[in-house]
Amino acid sequence: MAESKRPRVFFDIQIGQQQTGRIAFELFNDVVPKTAENFRALCTGEKGMGKQGKPLHFKGSIFHRVIKQFMIQGGDFTAFNGTGGESIYGEKFPDENFELKHDRPFLLSMANSGPGTNGSQFFITTVPTPHLDGKHVVFGEVINGKSVVRKIENMPTQADKPTTDVTIAECGELTGEDYDNADKQTPDATGDPYEDFPDDHQGEELSAPVCFKIASELKNFGNTAFKNGNIALGLEKYQKGLRYLNEFPEPEENDPKDLEPQMKSLRFTLHSNSSLLANKLGQFKNGKTWATYALDVADAASAKDADRAKVYYRRAVAESGLKEEDEALKDLEQASTLAPSDAAIAAETARVKKAIKAREAQEKATARKFFS
């Protein structure tokens, strides 16, 4: 049994219709027992129906408010918009104490509308938020699933609400082996054991060589996912690799001399691969952007002509998808110069020329109609 006897609970998160992962929490019942017990019981649903006629249970509720570089907020299981919720003690209960501070990311704290108005709504910090000290009660922390929190934090929002529902599909209390293993980081389906964001990395201190090693592994995880037909996951791994590389854009003075060209080459490959997979997902704007990034570092990466040709081709595919056929044709001409015998480039060039011809014919027909 783990030394800590603090309660541990979990949320299984669903984004849209996609099962996303689990967030595990440890609750500080030794500091704020009443507040911790409220959250624990709302995870299990053991208190039954509330005074508002809704189950006292987080299951099925959503994260209704997300502000990047601040926090993600949920717990309104009555109105689902931040105006509702109910504690196990009644609608509201007093602030227990402000002993714990908002001094780091991944803390659990009570949302409120002023002093003594705690209900069921909570938030998870994603950065230190000292301006909330003395106003909101900290009562727990995330011990696993930080990548899930970051995924929610980085979702598109409108008026601070995620544009796709982020739902607590299941929740409860962890016991036995589940309790003991709750804080252990486990690899995902690709074998990736790393946190999604370098700021959350634990273990070996990050340095340029370490980040290069991690990014190289992530490239391989992405390749595996792509080969297995999971294009979205492959793209996630390539982008994650770039996040780790970006922690140290350049090697430091005492790093190996051959590290810099290796880092630049890996950056080129990750951008190029990202463009390929974005295009396959129909994300043509991203496909164009990432191909452009690859070309921006191609010289520094000493990229081979064949690899440059691939990137020009991938940018052309993205531009064609964006109906930017003239730009696509220019990139295909560059690609053809670098790889004159490439059949895919020739086929795409013919297709784009046909599209341009059809567009010009349509424009002429429209002009004739306008002036007739």
Swiss-Prot record:
One cellular component (GO) term of this entry = cytoplasm
Does the keyword Nucleus feature in the UniProt annotation?
A: no
- At the top level, the lineage of the source is Eukaryota
GO molecular-function term, one example from the UniProt record: peptidyl-prolyl cis-trans isomerase activity
Quick check: keyword Isomerase in the entry?
Answer: yes
Query: Which residue ranges contain the repeat TPR?
Result: 215-248, 268-304, 309-342
State the Pfam families in the record: Pro_isomerase (PF00160)
- Enumerate the spans annotated as PPIase cyclophilin-type domain: 10-173
Q: Where is this region: Disordered?
A: 174-193
Instruction: Provide the alphabetized UniProt keywords.
Output: Cytoplasm, Isomerase, Repeat, Rotamase, TPR repeat
Could you state one GO biological process linked to this protein?
protein refolding
Tell me what reaction this enzyme catalyses.
Answer: [protein]-peptidylproline (omega=180) = [protein]-peptidylproline (omega=0)
InterPro entries listed in its UniProt record: Cyclophilin-like_dom_sf (IPR029000), Cyclophilin-type_PPIase_CS (IPR020892), Cyclophilin-type_PPIase_dom (IPR002130), TPR-like_helical_dom_sf (IPR011990), TPR_rpt (IPR019734)
Q: Which Gene3D superfamilies match?
A: Cyclophilin-like, Tetratricopeptide repeat domain
What's its EC? 5.2.1.8
Q: Which top class of enzyme applies to this chain?
A: isomerase
Q: Where in the cell is it found?
A: Cytoplasm
Q: What does this protein do?
A: PPIases accelerate the folding of proteins. It catalyzes the cis-trans isomerization of proline imidic peptide bonds in oligopeptides.
**What family is this protein classified in?**
Belongs to the cyclophilin-type PPIase family. PPIase D subfamily.
Protein name, entry field: Peptidyl-prolyl cis-trans isomerase D
Taxonomic source organism? Emericella nidulans (strain FGSC A4 / ATCC 38163 / CBS 112.46 / NRRL 194 / M139)
- Recorded name of the encoding gene: cpr6
